[in-house]
């Protein structure tokens, strides 16, 4: 029953769009409050100790954190800002998005870590989470430059001939 409440809270959370129709601060407060409600209910599900619903709830919470981060990254700077001001605005949003991604990653990593090996996963929450988590983790490293490694001619050791 608690998980069904989590699903309805997630639906309410997802309905709150960051679209600029209302002041962004108001939209952010509403979305953050909805996320907090979802997190509290998810903690209640986890406290019950039922592995099946705990996994489902943890996955949903991690998904919500990622969705919030995605919504922040999709925002554009207000037309009243230009140049460095617009870049600074977008940088703040990006920093907040990466914090949400980090929390989502921690939630999902914990879900995967706590799943005992060989454990039955009847609803596939662990495998679903792994499938979605690994590409997310890889995205963190896309902006890092590739390192060039010098190539050195290898010589056969004297005892190898």
Language model features: what each stretch is:
Residues 1-161:
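Acidic, polar-rich low-complexity tracts and alpha-helical solenoid repeat scaffolds
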């Amino acid at each position: 029953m608690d998980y069904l409440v989590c699903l309805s809270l997630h639906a309410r959370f997802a309905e709150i769009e960051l679209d600029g129709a209302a002041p962004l601060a108001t939209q952010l407060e509403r979305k953050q409050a909805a996320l907090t409600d979802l997190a509290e209910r998810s903690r209640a599900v986890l406290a019950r100790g039922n592995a099946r619903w705990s996994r489902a709830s943890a996955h949903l919470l991690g998904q919500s954190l990622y969705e919030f981060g995605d919504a922040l990254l999709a925002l554009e700077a207000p037309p009243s800002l230009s140049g460095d001001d617009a870049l600074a605005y977008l940088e703040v949003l990006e920093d907040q998005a990466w914090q949400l991604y980090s929390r989502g990653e921690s939630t999902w990593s914990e879900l995967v870590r706590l799943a005992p090996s060989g454990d039955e996963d009847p609803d596939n929450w662990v495998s679903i989470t792994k499938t979605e988590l690994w590409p997310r983790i890889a995205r963190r490293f896309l902006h890092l430059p590739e390192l060039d490694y010098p190539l050195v001619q290898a010589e056969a050791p004297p005892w190898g001939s």
